[in-house]
């Protein structure tokens, strides 16, 4: 055995690399007084290190950890006696102690990408260090650091001098001297060669092939550390008075170092790797318990009871919080240099540095379902996909570290808080796609755990342990599908979750990353050979027979068809298998029950709406099992029949087969209506909701003075408490429905207490809510309030505001006699009778098309046949729906059925609407006042344009309205008086006469267009679209007829041969202009009316759909 000269430094070694610095054969007083004796003792210790380093193996030495400080920076006595020569750094509580992290020689060779140093740190980082070397290649350098403290402790304790040194260690630790971060070796019998099991679980096994850290770099300018005394974090309060440490750590999370420390001396974090337990056969263990070569079998067998005792001690001891902090700080230090080019390497380093058993089930739920806690803490062992047994302490530590690291990727600006010297431009985390990071992290974890790379010796043939390359991807694909089916996401559908599966090319790159030295060879007969990985085997805890059978018997295309088909999916009903044991909270229980999971999967191809699939949980705890099963079977049968020809909108709560309730009163005007009962049901379903608080936030004018008041109160008083409380499932939907039901009567103006100021402030606050609500939810980042659902809620809020605009505009318009007259005339002339088309000359090219050739320009036009019948037939054909059988349209439908269906709609437009326009609603006023009011509103000075109540949410009352029914307004009312009256804000938005008209219109729609005849036969989507077709065709028909009248009038004026005087000409032009204005006003009235009906029916349908998602 050669004795290579040990490389030495010119500067004195610190306590880490020089154990004789603190402990010499002399007494404590002699240490402080005799410097020559210290140097002699240090030389002796260095010789022992040289001799020891040549006879043992060293693995996984973290280069940047092994900083060796000069003696003057760590001498406890010198720091207290020579205060003028040493300075205390504010963030110096981090103990810079060097460790060589060792692993078993049976451990497989790790990623070569990890061997390469992570790219250079950002320029703002105070220290630049090389990447940690967990797995080294052969080198001839020797390690100067103190790498085998356990062995030396045993040598010291075996002699009286060693016992004295051990006593000095305890005395020094009490006096503020940082003790080495090693576990005690008292459990190891004297003379045993087995390495002790420490608090860091360093199972040391040395090798002469392990490279050492080139300590000559320690004193380069890039690695130089400030010379100030360092103390351990536990003793900082006593040495510094506690002021600086308390100030720096006041805002820090538990278990992390202060940013000031990480910004100045972050290169000294200690890496603490830990081997897996005996029962864990994931790839991180790498067969540490056996070897095919048998090189170390005799050593393991010779340990006997000592080995068992050591292993038991590791199993029973929880990993200390100090170790968790060390690992996190180590990873956090490397996070500063992470960008898109090395993110995969960093993710792999997280798993290897934590090096603790953590099941795929917990890992998947940590990434996609619940980052605050483990979802499977109470689940049955047999129901897990990964059967690896783990300890709760290891799981908690892993969850804590990964959660903290993921927060940096979600909020990259947090990194600057931990590293104050780092500039924003050097922070590359913002350029990393978070979704891509999560699915890549999951893929690395799966690859890391499903395979075991065997350490093949020269006598073993690696071809005895082979796995086809395609089988690895198919196994990865199957496991992802199994995780998706077993643990449905609360915010995404199964189709959305499919996006987390990587393609073959990217997974192949990750295989090379995780297993860089894995041998690959084409095996098989000529023409049928396939690429196989050599020297690997499956982890039986994860890859079980069921997965192997699917992988061996099916090609990749067949697997895609199997998992995309609900009938053939072998894991479609896996999720509820452990539901009985996972119901520690109501939310967990409802999200993992068999019926709800199956229903999600069964109805997904029907609805085609990715936002609604998580909402379709069966409300089984309110119904009997038999009734629920029967109802579900009927719904699934109807869904299967309609699934191919009806698709729900993406931003909608409606399902494909949602229908209006038939046995309830849908009119908002009645006291005991469906909306009132639904509101009570919402608060009964979620007791955590406070109705008085919601009404106070939304409907009290004093809480709506600022545009942001509603949003701030909603977040602080309602949503944030709901996030912290234990609530039932779909709490967000219940809250949204309760809010819509509370503000619905106010925006529809059916509440008599609605005044101008309240409506104006409410609209402004709702507009602010629409623009900023999703941003607040993103900051909250709670699975209880997914963005997909809140987006649909905001669409409904915007629909309510638009409905309020249309409603006010239409009521104000039809309150004028000329508007009522023109609309009534349109019905009499164009809809009620068989209108005759005026024949124009063929050479008349004054219009953009010939009106005689249009379908609505026929001589004998029939509104019932040409519009109503055709639109209903087009709707049934377009949706491929037969209302007589409530199924797919397979045969023709008789015209008698069509005529019977449209009779109600025909009666609505020809008679009901005409009576509504012709009836005067005076609301208790005498006729004179009503006529004067109408005349006044028809005047040119009191017009009410549509833009007065536009999307900006600004409302203004009628300029001439005084709000007093008994006092009619006058034309001579000054503007100042009107403005002064409006400022009082106590006037109602509508006059009593207008309110009566509004109530009549809403009642007409509820009872005629939403009659039971249509509600029982047609889905909401189909019926609402049919009404929209009819309204649009009516609008087009009226427009064409009005254009015909204008053309006829202009043609008659051109053919008039009588001479016109100048006065007659002016009168003719004025008359023509007046007719044109009337025509335009009539068309505008019809447009507002049509838009109001469509928005109103759409809103009612959405409320029904939202309710259906809760039952």
From Swiss-Prot:
InterPro entries for this protein: DNA-bd_RFX, Mediator/Homeobox_domain, WH-like_DNA-bd_sf, WH_DNA-bd_sf
A Pfam family the protein falls into: RFX_DNA_binding
Keyword terms, alphabetized: DNA damage, DNA-binding, Nucleus, Repressor, Transcription, Transcription regulation, Virulence
Effect of loss of the gene: Leads to increased resistance to UV-killing, derepression of various stress-related genes, hyperfilamentous growth, and overexpression of hypha-specific genes.
Residue range(s) of DNA binding per entry: 450-540
Subcellular location: Nucleus
Sequence ranges of Polar residues compositional bias: 69-78, 183-196, 570-585, 949-979, 1055-1070
Record has Ribonucleoprotein as a keyword: no
Upregulation: Expression is negatively regulated by NRG1, and by the contact with host oral epithelial cells. Up-regulated during the yeast-to-hypha transition through the function of YAK1. Also regulated by SWI4, SWI6, and WOR1, a transcriptional regulator of white-opaque switching.
Biased composition (Basic residues): 1-13, 589-600, 618-628
Molecular function GO labels: DNA binding; DNA-binding transcription factor activity; DNA-binding transcription repressor activity
GO BP field: adhesion of symbiont to host; cellular response to heat; cellular response to oxidative stress; cellular response to UV; DNA damage response; filamentous growth; filamentous growth of a population of unicellular organisms; negative regulation of filamentous growth of a population of unicellular organisms
Sequence segments annotated as region (Disordered): 1-199, 300-320, 570-642, 925-988, 1050-1076
Source organism superkingdom: Eukaryota
Composition bias type Low complexity, residue spans: 32-68, 79-88, 129-142, 153-175, 300-310
Acidic residues bias (residue ranges): 926-938
Cellular component terms per the entry's GO annotation: NELF complex
PANTHER family for the chain: HOMEOBOX PROTEIN BARH-LIKE (PTHR24330), MEDIATOR OF RNA POLYMERASE II TRANSCRIPTION SUBUNIT 29 (PTHR24330:SF19)
Protein family membership: Belongs to the RFX family.
Purpose of the protein: Transcriptional repressor which regulates DNA damage responses, morphogenesis, and virulence. Involved in the regulation of filamentous growth through its repression of hyphal-specific genes such as HWP1, ALS3, HYR1, ECE1, and CEK1.
Name by which UniProt lists this protein: RFX-like DNA-binding protein RFX2
Lineage: Eukaryota, Fungi, Dikarya, Ascomycota, Saccharomycotina
């Amino acid at each position: 055995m050669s004795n290579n000269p040990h490389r030495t430094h010119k500067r004195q070694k610190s306590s880490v690399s020089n154990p004789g610095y603190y402990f010499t054969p002399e007494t404590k007083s002699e240490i402080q007084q005799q410097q020559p004796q210290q140097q002699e003792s240090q030389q002796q210790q260095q010789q022992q290190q040289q001799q020891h380093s040549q006879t043992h193996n060293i693995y996984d030495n973290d280069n940047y950890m092994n900083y060796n400080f000069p003696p003057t920076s760590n001498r406890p006595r010198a720091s207290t006696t020579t205060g003028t020569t040493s300075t205390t750094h504010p963030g110096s509580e981090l103990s810079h102690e060097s460790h060589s992290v060792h692993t078993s020689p049976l451990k497989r060779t790790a990623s070569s990408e990890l061997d390469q140093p992570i790219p250079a740190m950002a320029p703002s980082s105070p220290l630049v260090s090389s990447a940690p070397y967990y797995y080294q290649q052969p080198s001839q350098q020797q390690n100067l650091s103190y790498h085998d403290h356990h062995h030396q402790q045993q040598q010291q304790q075996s002699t009286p001098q060693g016992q004295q040194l051990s006593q000095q260690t305890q005395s020094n630790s009490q006096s503020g001297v940082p003790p080495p971060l090693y576990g005690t070796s008292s459990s190891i019998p004297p003379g045993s060669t087995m390495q002790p099991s420490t608090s860091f679980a360093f199972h040391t096994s040395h090798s002469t092939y392990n490279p050492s850290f080139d300590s000559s770099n320690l004193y380069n300018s890039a690695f130089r550390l400030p010379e100030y005394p360092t103390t351990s974090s536990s003793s900082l309060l006593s040495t510094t008075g506690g002021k600086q440490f308390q100030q720096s750590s006041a805002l820090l999370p538990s278990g992390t170092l202060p940013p000031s420390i990480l910004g100045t001396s972050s290169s000294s974090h200690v890496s603490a790797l830990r081997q897996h337990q005996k029962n864990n056969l994931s790839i991180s263990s790498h067969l540490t318990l056996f070897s095919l070569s048998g090189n170390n079998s005799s050593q393991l067998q010779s340990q006997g009871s000592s080995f068992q005792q050591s292993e038991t001690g590791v199993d029973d001891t929880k990993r200390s919080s100090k170790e968790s902090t060390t690992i996190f700080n180590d990873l956090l230090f490397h996070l500063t240099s992470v960008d898109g080019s090395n993110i995969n390497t960093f993710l792999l380093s997280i798993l290897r540095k934590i090096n603790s058993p953590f099941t795929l089930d917990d890992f998947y739920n940590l990434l996609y379902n619940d980052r605050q806690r483990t979802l499977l803490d109470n689940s049955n062992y047999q129901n897990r996909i990964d059967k690896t047994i783990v300890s709760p302490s290891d799981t908690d530590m892993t969850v804590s570290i990964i959660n903290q690291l993921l927060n940096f990727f979600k909020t990259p600006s947090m990194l600057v808080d931990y590293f104050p010297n780092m500039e924003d431009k050097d922070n590359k985390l913002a350029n990393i796609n978070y979704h891509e990071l999560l699915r890549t992290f999951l893929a690395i974890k799966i690859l890391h755990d499903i395979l075991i790379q065997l350490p093949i010796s020269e006598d073993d043939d690696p071809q005895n342990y082979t796995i086809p390359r395609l089988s690895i991807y198919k196994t990865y694909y199957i496991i992802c599908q199994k995780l998706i089916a077993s643990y449905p996401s609360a915010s995404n559908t199964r189709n959305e979750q499919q996006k987390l599966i990587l393609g073959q090319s990217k997974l192949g790159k990750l295989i090379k990353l995780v297993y860089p030295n894995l041998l690959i060879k084409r095996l098989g007969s000529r023409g049928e050979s396939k690429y196989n990985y050599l020297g690997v085997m499956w982890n039986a805890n994860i890859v079980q027979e069921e997965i192997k059978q699917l992988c061996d018997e099916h090609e990749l295309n067949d697997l895609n068809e199997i998992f995309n088909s609900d009938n053939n999916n072998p894991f479609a009903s896996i999720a509820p298998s452990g539901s009985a044991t996972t119901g520690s909270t109501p939310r967990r229980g409802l999200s993992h029950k068999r019926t709800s999971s199956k229903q999600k999967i069964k109805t997904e191809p029907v609805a085609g709406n990715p936002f609604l699939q998580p909402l379709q949980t069966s409300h089984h705890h309110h119904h009997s099992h038999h009734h629920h099963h029967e109802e579900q079977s009927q719904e699934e049968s109807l869904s299967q029949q309609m699934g191919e020809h009806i698709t729900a909108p993406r931003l909608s709560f409606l399902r494909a087969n949602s229908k209006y309730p038939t046995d309830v009163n849908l009119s908002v005007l009645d006291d005991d209506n469906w909306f009132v009962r639904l509101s009570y049901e919402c608060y009964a379903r979620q007791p955590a909701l406070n109705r008085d608080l919601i009404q106070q936030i939304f409907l009290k004018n004093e809480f709506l003075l600022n545009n942001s008041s509603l949003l701030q109160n909603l977040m602080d008083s309602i949503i944030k408490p709901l996030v912290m409380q234990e609530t039932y499932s779909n709490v967000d939907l219940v809250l949204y429905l309760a809010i819509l039901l509370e503000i619905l009567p106010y925006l529809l103006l059916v509440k008599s207490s609605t005044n101008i100021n309240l409506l104006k402030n409410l609209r402004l606050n709702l507009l602010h809510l629409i623009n900023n609500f999703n941003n607040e939810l993103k900051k909250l980042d709670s699975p209880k309030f997914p963005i997909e659902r809140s987006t649909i809620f905001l669409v409904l809020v915007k629909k309510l505001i638009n409905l309020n605009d249309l409603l006010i505009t239409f009521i104000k318009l039809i309150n004028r006699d000329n508007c009522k007259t023109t609309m009534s005339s349109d019905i009499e002339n164009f809809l009620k009778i068989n209108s005759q088309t005026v024949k124009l000359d063929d050479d008349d090219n004054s219009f953009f098309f010939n009106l005689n050739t249009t379908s609505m320009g026929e001589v004998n036009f029939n509104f019932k046949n040409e519009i109503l019948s055709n639109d209903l037939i087009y709707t049934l054909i377009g949706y491929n729906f037969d209302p007589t059988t409530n199924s797919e349209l397979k045969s023709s439908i008789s015209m008698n059925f069509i005529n019977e269906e449209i009779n109600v709609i025909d009666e609505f437009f020809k008679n009901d609407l005409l009576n509504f326009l012709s009836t005067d609603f005076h609301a208790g006023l005498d006729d004179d006042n009503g006529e004067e009011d109408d005349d006044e509103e028809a005047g040119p000075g009191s017009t009410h344009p549509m833009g007065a109540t536009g999307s900006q949410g600004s409302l203004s009352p009628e300029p001439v309205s005084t709000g007093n029914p008994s006092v009619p307004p006058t034309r001579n009312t000054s503007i100042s008086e009107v403005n002064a009256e409006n400022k009082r804000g106590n006037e109602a938005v509508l006059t009593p006469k207008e309110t009566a008209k509004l109530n009549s219109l809403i009642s007409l729609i509820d009872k005629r267009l939403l009659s039971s005849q249509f509600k029982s036969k047609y889905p909401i989507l189909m019926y609402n679209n049919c009404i929209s077709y009819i309204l649009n065709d009516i609008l087009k028909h009226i427009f064409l007829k009005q254009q015909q009248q204008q053309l006829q009038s202009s043609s008659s004026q051109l053919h008039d041969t009588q001479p016109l005087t100048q006065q007659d000409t002016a009168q003719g032009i004025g008359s023509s202009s007046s007719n044109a204005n009337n025509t335009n006003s009539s068309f505008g009235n019809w447009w507002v009316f049509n838009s109001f009906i469509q928005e109103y029916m759409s809103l009612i349908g959405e409320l029904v759909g939202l309710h259906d998602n809760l039952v």
